[in-house]
Amino acid sequence: MKGYKNYGTHLREKYNGQRVFKVIVDGGFTCPNRDGSKGFGGCTYCNVDSFTPEPSRKMPTIREQLEEGIKRARTSYKADKFIVYFQPNTNTYAPTHYLKMMYDEALSINTEDIVGFSVGTRPDCIDAEKVALLESYADRFDVDLEMGMESIYDETLEQINRGCSHGEFVAAVKLLENSKLDLCVHTIFGFPWETKEMMHGYIHEINRFPQIKFVKFHHLHIVEGSIMGAKYKKEPFKLFTLEEYTDLLCELIPMLRPDIVIQRLFGISDWDLLIAPNWGLNKSAIQTYIDKALEKREVVQGSLYLD
């Protein structure tokens, strides 16, 4: 038995042992720090090109994406039920009436097997009207809002061209007090100018907000097509080894509030995009390595949590 609340177990328990799989939908959204409203280039760690369809390539419709994704998940993973996951870019960065049209289309497909709805966004692209829209689906689906915190330090957010402050993150989280939505928070550990003690601060901040039900932990990795990637090629900087990152997780997980479900422990990138760190293992092997280390060290989520 794992010493932390992992997402796979959470889904099996919630849906009576059925295999539940997230199906990613690209709604063609952009980001305010990419389109000029708050800046250009996007977050410096982000592969902008991967979100920019070639002019000659027609993006599949939402229906086509979902039907293909569900078919693939049934065949490859024996999935029974599905969560519609609007993931790439900022999926609330549009007028509410347009968002409703997009969401309605996605949630009208294969409705008997859709159990959840997940929307990825930024703190500065959510407001009360959009929260109300997402809540309107909560009587039919389990709805979660996935929001990028990335770092709690404004100097870091400025360096990575995030285009929003930690104060905006806190304000967005407070919008979800007493909400029907579950909040998932995304963090990145390993910015080279942040100390381990600073990263501990992420956990203390997450613990403050009872509306945070899920977390995704990522280590910083450098990919082709990113601003940070170009800088790294010119002048490499320190990144986590697998052993160092595992050590950090062994420190952080005991500090994490015990009711929070960990959806992800590390980031992953396509091999053809990854510049560094190359740990030489696939996703499954990394997960196994980390889980074995956590078990060996008898790490228990919440054992060092201070209410």
Identify the residue ranges that each predicted region occupies:
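N-terminal [4Fe-4S]-dependent radical SAM core
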Residues: 1-44, 48-83
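Auxiliary Fe-S-binding modules of radical SAM enzymes
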Residues: 2-12, 16-21, 221-307
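Hydrophobic faces of well-ordered beta-strands that scaffold small-molecule active sites
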Residues: 21-25, 82-84, 117-119, 143-147, ...
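Conserved SAM/AdoMet-binding glycine-rich loop
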Residues: 76-164, 171-172, 177-178
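Active-site-proximal loop/turn and secondary-structure-junction residues that shape catalytic pockets
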Residues: 88-92, 123-125, 149-153, 187-193, ...
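Short, electropositive alpha-helical surface patch
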Residues: 100-106, 135, 195-213, 242-243, ...
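Glycine-rich tight-turn/loop motif centered on a GG-T
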Residues: 155-166, 230-239
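Conserved C-terminal portion of the radical SAM core fold
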Residues: 167-227, 243-266
